[in-house]
């Protein structure tokens, strides 16, 4: 970061000549100089080039107006105003809080001024670099000889082998120098929360509005287990979202606790709704306790916020209503909600403390922000036992944590601070909104069919759109007022074939075809439903990527309308079974899969599969204990009724458990099995469309098999 912007020239010698001298002096110190044509040009430069580290301008020409506009973009950026003896310095005490320095126009002072600018630039870079990352950068630059782990010794070992050299050249020297041992005392300890690691935790907590934050280097799957192991002791009961991530299902297998399921809604499209308000009432919880063996009043609750499809809760209502001492919001998909006003009141850390309750929020920093994979955070607000919690933290944390991941977590937080952070999130929201409008425009202009978007009819302004009772766009028949809200950056594209109420048309285009088409053109879909595709507009999505997706959708329509051969349109799919797809055209394939969905009454089957939960014969923990003792056997999927499942079964998409360990499918919950068998049948009819079902394995004959407990009824 070495770019200085200079506003000028001014057409007068006494101003232009000192600036020319300063330009030469700055270049000799390694700075790159750019010359914006005017203030509009400058502001565009700053907005789109974060590597600019200073602005030089004439005070008489631009004064505080320019400073204020720059501060809206980056309040930390150093500003250098040049004045003459007649300049009026109408600067208030508040204005002096800006990073603003004054210099006089004079010849012969260029080197001295350049030295000062170099100093202020270093201070700026030091100021925006968070504490642990700064310490890690410093250590990596020192190049100390170490006789401890890791064995690659800052990458030296890699350069002693041809494959190692390839690895070194790909990742680069700094990445490997930053991969250091916990033996480096000046970097402190992640496990003991000392030194720069402690400073990083405090820095992150301030940034995210938490009272305490913990950095986790092996994903939110682990963060969820840490919180659960602390909050729900053996023998206790907890409330848990049935839409939970499988890491929470694994927590139930690890901990001897009794789960009470909070049952969410779904619409006919298969989009996951939230947990309705009625599930949070004392009466509802009391009924669950009374109906569940060994259950007591719950000590802890786990809510998935947001849902996979981007629905956020009014978390302030939940925190006040839910009568449990400890609430965990699994917010893996929304680590950005603290940084834009449209998300106010929709995150775990929003608002003040709730008397008598502790609030936990886990976030996958890597999912939608700029952090390395497995980067995760735990935020806490409320009273808790810090020493006991840290035991749970250490229980699940490696004694050799990845310091590059730690630095990436902290840097992700640094990127969100101040006006630059707000602008970063706002740009993501605006880009998603623009994309939504473009799809709407193309749909309106199309003379036949085009894709639709799951959203209200009017989306003129950026907001979290409420899922309001009585409106038809969302497809939820029993929506609650002021409860669930659609996140604008989670964009769900709808394909023809089914509407939000589950009415299936004569013809349709299953979303899996579109996903395969896009994938072959370098566009990867986050989630594919029967007739919908989910795209995430994270802060890394730029205009080029958004336009690439739009182009991919229009190219699919063009190819589909031409009814191209599968061989030409989807060559990777064709390669799965050339004999089967040899003469097939894309419309024949689409209508074949669509016909299967209609025959099985897909929307009705999906709703029934999630309407009645299977019977819990034993807790997931008890079922796991039976499994590790070897008390399991394998049966075909269609033999599952009446047997107690040893594993969780969850199809992708959407990755939500249909059957938990210790549960049994009964006649009342038979739709669970019918739904799974329907998913399997599509892959049996059409090669390349096999369903991924966690907990079920497909043998060589194409039969899905599952594990059940022996002698359990």
Language model features: what each stretch is:
Residues 13-30, 39-57, 64, 70-72, ...:
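Non-catalytic terminal extensions of PLP-dependent enzymes
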Residues 36-45, 58, 65-68, 76, ...:
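Conserved PLP-enzyme active-site core in the AAT-like
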Residues 163-254, 260:
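Long, structured ligand/cofactor-binding scaffold of large enzymes
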